Amino acid sequence: MSLHQFLLEPITCHAWNRDRTQIALSPNNHEVHIYKKNGSQWVKAHELKEHNGHITGIDWAPKSDRIVTCGADRNAYVWSQKDGVWKPTLVILRINRAATFVKWSPLENKFAVGSGARLISVCYFESENDWWVSKHIKKPIRSTVLSLDWHPNNVLLAAGSCDFKCRVFSAYIKEVDEKPASTPWGSKMPFGQLMSEFGGSGTGGWVHGVSFSASGSRLAWVSHDSTVSVADASKSVQVSTLKTEFLPLLSVSFVSENSVVAAGHDCCPMLFNYDDRGCLTFVSKLDIPKQSIQRNMSAMERFRNMDKRATTEDRNTALETLHQNSITQVSIYEVDKQDCRKFCTTGIDGAMTIWDFKTLESSIQGLRIM
């Protein structure tokens, strides 16, 4: 595991470039900072300044090398690099509330933006007018959209929202998409078609994170009631929900067809397993706790505590986990959702950690990624 403390401020969101030599992140304001790997150090290479509200989402397209950002100013920008300079192009989202989340489609010919306007803007490039336009998915969303993920077929889109529901929509756009083949989620896919809807019958919570598996037949989501759920379209959309004893999880990703990593307010990533019988189980926390050492306090530390915490007591407030505050995002760092070797987390503590499954398997007894 390698931890890098980028900021004192929270990292709102992050995205990696294709070869993982650069990371784009937002330091909880209206800017995007791009850091470049230089040996073992991360050096700030660019600052993207066009938004005038907090940035809420970043995604970096691996093939076309374009960055898309969205923010509380109700705007989205597509950034392209020319002669070493990042240039923004405004996207017409047509929303009257903050944008909350953005995600490129697998073929990078469109992207989806969630918002507080109770809708999803699916944006694509109109070459005859030379601009990005959007189509809206509105019904039956009843509240802010918090999270999105694309199906590998480039057409289906999963959305988690504050109305306690996780939904799968068709985001088929005839201008840019070929006619999609039938999937286990359904065969008729006109734009905006609701393919599946889960949760919300008097129970549940805000759906903070959603993730399709590499095959696209499974969908995982995490909710504010501390549950993890997986729906399996190949088993006639059977849903397995696991009520955990942890604080709510905020982000989730498949790391193999049967394994899911999620993280949130407990400050450490957790591994869950979904077997072929449709049973969802908690496997392990993926953070090895540091041993706290009892020792005398130096005068320097006593004064520092007076300054920082208005106390001279030796109360160790550091958490035993690597992250010292909630983890807000989990992303794949090495390989893909089919066979993830390393994954990355960023959090409110301003830190970024890269987790290596090989190292974790050797240090946590009985841990195996299925």
UniProtKB/Swiss-Prot annotation:
WD repeats lie at residues 6-45, 50-89, 140-179, 202-241, 244-284, 322-365. Keywords: Actin-binding, Cytoplasm, Cytoskeleton, Nucleus, Repeat, WD repeat. One of its GO terms (molecular function) is actin binding. PROSITE patterns: WD_REPEATS_2 (PS50082), WD_REPEATS_REGION (PS50294). Coiled coil: none annotated. Pfam families: WD40. Probably functions as a component of the Arp2/3 complex which is involved in regulation of actin polymerization and together with an activating nucleation-promoting factor (NPF) mediates the formation of branched actin networks. Probable component of the Arp2/3 complex in which it may replace ARPC1B. In addition to its role in the cytoplasmic cytoskeleton, the Arp2/3 complex also promotes actin polymerization in the nucleus, thereby regulating gene transcription and repair of damaged DNA. PANTHER family: ACTIN-RELATED PROTEIN 2/3 COMPLEX SUBUNIT 1, ACTIN-RELATED PROTEIN 2_3 COMPLEX SUBUNIT 1A. This is Actin-related protein 2/3 complex subunit 1A. It comes from Homo sapiens (Human).
